Each structure stands twice: as structure tokens, then as C-alpha cells.
Design a protein with these regions (language model features):
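Positively charged n-region of N-terminal signal peptides that target proteins for export
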Residues: 1-4, 233
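Sec-dependent N-terminal signal peptides
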Residues: 4-13
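C-terminal motif of bacterial Sec signal peptides marking the signal peptidase cleavage site
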Residues: 15-17
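N-terminal, active-site-proximal structural segment of metallo-dependent hydrolase catalytic domains
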Residues: 19-118, 128, 133-136, 326, ...
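Metal-dependent phosphoester-hydrolase catalytic domains
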Residues: 19-33, 167, 214-229, 235-346
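Active-site metal-binding loops of divalent metal-dependent hydrolases
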Residues: 51-54, 102, 191, 233-234, ...
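Metal-dependent phosphoester/phosphodiester hydrolase catalytic core
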Residues: 60, 179-210, 214
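Structured beta-strand-rich core segments of catalytic domains in phosphoester-bond hydrolases
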Residues: 102-191
Length: 346
């Protein structure tokens, strides 16, 4: 069983809840679908961003090689990078911000301190933060929220049926946030990269998709009134999921089908991606001369997404329109991904 590190804290106050889950195939009796409703409720601004290998200046041994071997990486550059990250977060000003590729809880605490900057404003600060990373791995994910975080569950793969050994895979975070007496459930993802070959590694992203689908189905079967957001860096473009553009009755208002073992009527669960309806952007990630939509925000349950866009203006973008990737050698840039932003209607 994998060991994992997880934290939920309110300005230094620690309280945690967790669950380590092995993927299994079970029968569920619930009728799962994307709910359709004209109701427009509470508006919550939301952002999701892969901040590109955000390490501190302390060597722990799990850093990527370029950070361990580079003489140019130091505390001064780290502090400058912290300032830039916090400037972007303040500019986004989203109520909930999800960050991928954060090294540790120490980095999360540094971000929190830089965001406060000696000024306490309960209405503007992100007073609730949680973080998770598997022990011995390099990076994890963090959630910054202006609303109370009720619960954090951690789900890990433990696959032993493939002919090859399961590689290291990052955990799935399930974060429950209470917003005006209503629960918003986040499933935060950072799936297996394509390093080692896109085809060769696709099986592990398939398993991570199945884990996500199963956890979503399971939670929804107990709390059908909840609003769900599935977000993160999936290392799979949205067009490469099973897409349902016909909007069939069983997938009302949904356009993507996720594999989900345990669904009695089918082996998928229907979710909604705003990429196809709202955004005219080519993508959020630029690699080998091609735009990709591997960063995603999906909705499910009693939730609508509005005003979805890629934040690709200002300092985050290079002259050619691609993300201003961070370089440890000159200390310039931000990330090789653009942030995704939207409004959630609960």
C-alpha cells in the first residue's frame, strides 16, 4: 500500500481526514447522470493551474535532476518565483484555486505567507488550504480556498493485473468544500505523464480515469445533491476522451464520458467539459509545436460552469502566444501551462 502525505490547515491549524483506496470493480445501483437545471445559484470563481515543477531551494533528494544539479537554483530565485506566483494568484482572484506540481507542504506554507503579506483580510485571503503528495515522490497538488474545507480523501492506484509493474502515479485528491451550507466536491488530478511513450503509458491514464469515475459514482450515490468539479492536468487532451456531442438523454448537458467501473447501466459516467462550448483558445499547453488541452475542468451533479477561459494574457505569455515557461537558469518565466478559469454556479 502506498504511503502518502496530506494536510488540511487553516492558517497553521492542522486537521485531516483520509482514505487510501485500491481500485476495485463492484456493482453500484445508482442511476448516474449529469443533472440538467435552469437554476442559477451561488457563483464561485474557480481556477486550475499547473505551475511547472515548483520546488523550494532546499534539497530533499526527491527533486527533479535539473534542480538538484543546477548551481543557478538558489533561495533568491525561489523567493522571486514565489512573488510571481502570488501575483498571478491575486490577479486571478478566484475563490478556489487548484495548483499542480507543488513540491511540499513547506512550499504551500510559503505561498500562503506571501499571499497574506502581513495583511489580514478574511474576505480576500485564501484561509483554507490542503495538499497531498505520495511519500518519496517529487510533486503534489494543493487547493487554496476562501471557503471552509470540510474533508480531504486520498485515493491511490494499486494495479497488479498488468504485465508490467505499475509506475509511480500521483494520488487523486477528493476535497469537500462547504459553500453556504452546500458541498462542492473537487476531484483533483495529475495523471501519468507521457514520458516513456504516449502509447506505452496510456494504460495507466486509463486506470486513473477508471479510479476517478468509480470514486465519482460512489460519492454521488450517497450525496446526489452535491456539486462536483473534476480538474487538473490529465496529460490527455479533452478530444482524446470518449466524447458525446449528440447530448443523448442519458447524458443531458454532458459531452464527455469517463470510464467508471461499477456503473450498473454502463461502464461510463457522463460529465461536462466547457472546452467545446465556451473557449475559442487552441489550448493551455504548447508542446513540440502543437497546442494541447490536457488541462481540464469537468462538471457533474448540481453544478453549471460559466465564463470558462484560458488565462493567456499579460506576463504569462511569450510573444509567439505560447506559455512563458519558467527557466531555472535565468529565473525568468512562469509556467509551461496557462491557468484555466471559470465560474461555478452552485
Amino acid at each position: 500500500m502506498k504511503k502518502f502525505l496530506f494536510w488540511i490547515f487553516f492558517v497553521g491549524f492542522l486537521c485531516v481526514g483520509c482514505e487510501n483506496v485500491q481500485l476495485s470493480v463492484e456493482n453500484q445501483s445508482s442511476d448516474i447522470k449529469q443533472l440538467s437545471s435552469s437554476y442559477v445559484g451561488k457563483k464561485v470563481s474557480f481556477a486550475c493551474w499547473n505551475v511547472q515543477t515548483f520546488f523550494d531551494a532546499k534539497t530533499d533528494g526527491t527533486e527533479y535532476d535539473e534542480f538538484k544539479k543546477s548551481d543557478s537554483w538558489n533561495s533568491g530565485k525561489y523567493c522571486k518565483r514565489l512573488e510571481r506566483l502570488c501575483e498571478v494568484m491575486k490577479s486571478l482572484n478566484s475563490d478556489v484555486i487548484v495548483l499542480e506540481e507543488i513540491e511540499s507542504i513547506s512550499v504551500v506554507q510559503d505561498i500562503s505567507n506571501y499571499l497574506v503579506d502581513g495583511k489580514w483580510d478574511k474576505s480576500k485571503n485564501w484561509n483554507y488550504v490542503c495538499f497531498a503528495r505520495n511519500k518519496g515522490t517529487s510533486i503534489g497538488c494543493a487547493v487554496f480556498s476562501r471557503y471552509p474545507v470540510k474533508k480531504l480523501l486520498i485515493h491511490n492506484l494499486d494495479i497488479r493485473v498488468q504485465k508490467v509493474k505499475q509506475p509511480s502515479c500521483r494520488p487523486l485528491m477528493q476535497v469537500t468544500i462547504n459553500i453556504d451550507e452546500k458541498d462542492l466536491v473537487l476531484f483533483v488530478n495529475h495523471w501519468k505523464s507521457k514520458s516513456g511513450g504516449e502509447i506505452e503509458t496510456e494504460i495507466w491514464r486509463d486506470w486513473q480515469e477508471a479510479l476517478l469515475g468509480e470514486r465519482l459514482v460512489c460519492d454521488f450515490s450517497f450525496s446526489e445533491k452535491n456539486a462536483y468539479v473534476l480538474c487538473g492536468d490529465f496529460n490527455r487532451s479533452v478530444e482524446d476522451f470518449v466524447c458525446n456531442f449528440d447530448r443523448k438523454p442519458e447524458c443531458t448537458d454532458a459531452n464527455v464520458a469517463l470510464r467508471a467501473f461499477g456503473h450498473e447501466k454502463s461502464n461510463f459516467v457522463c460529465v461536462y467539459s466547457p472546452w467545446f462550448d465556451f473557449s475559442t483558445e487552441k489550448g493551455s499547453y504548447f508542446y513540440n509545436g502543437n497546442w494541447e488541452r490536457i488541462d481540464n475542468i469537468f462538471s457533474f451533479g448540481s453544478l453549471k460552469i460559466s465564463e470558462f477561459m484560458v488565462e493567456s494574457d499579460g506576463k504569462l505569455v511569450k510573444e509567439d502566444g505560447s506559455p512563458f515557461k519558467y527557466s531555472i537558469y535565468n529565473g525568468e518565466g512562469y509556467s509551461d501551462h496557462f491557468p484555466l478559469v471559470c465560474n461555478l454556479l452552485l
